[in-house]
């Protein structure tokens, strides 16, 4: 979780930072001013910030079957936003103290799908899903799995999770995207990235690459080889 007072920046002066409330989520209150584009400093402002912290999402892809493993679970805020409470998503979760994003990608994949990641996940992107109200950052990965092992219900019982595994071909995923049936932000980013890099991933992870030993060469020459996390 983020500290109450953020890192210093020459364009922002934090006058005061106080904790508002904290349950599962935490809200802090900031008094600050900032440098205006026209020059000089703004008037003092007061801002409520949701301190969501760091999260991870991972697109689980089987290159041999050209399938992706998604999860479906109930999201009350989606219902409040006028959307379906049953959301199709990539596996995701928050980073706990002492964890790295990569560790969370492995843990959440196991907890939410029962699958083990094969090899090392590829970093996709770090992005800010709602920086007008929250400090949350999301680190996205793409990881290889065996989709034939994906089935059933999963989740951590102590956390009240009720998660159903859903396997889709990439053609089916593309149709869902075109129909606007996937509404979750980090899932949209991850799936559009996967569609863009699908052919390369099949070369990198597919049976031909493994047989010929070309996986490492493809990774070093890849436009996606440099971690952004």
Regions found by a protein language model. Give the residues of each.
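A short coil-to-beta-strand element that immediately follows conserved catalytic motifs
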Residues: 13, 116-124
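Acidic, metal-coordinating catalytic segment for phosphate/diphosphate chemistry
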Residues: 20-65, 79
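Active-site-adjacent beta-strand/loop module that shapes the phosphate/pyrophosphate-binding cleft
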Residues: 32-36, 130-151
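Conserved Nudix-box catalytic region and its N-terminal flanking loop in Nudix hydrolases
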Residues: 47-50, 59, 67-107, 157-159, ...
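NUDIX/MutT-family hydrolases
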Residues: 155-181
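Acidic two-metal-ion nuclease catalytic site recognized across multiple nuclease folds
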Residues: 199-229
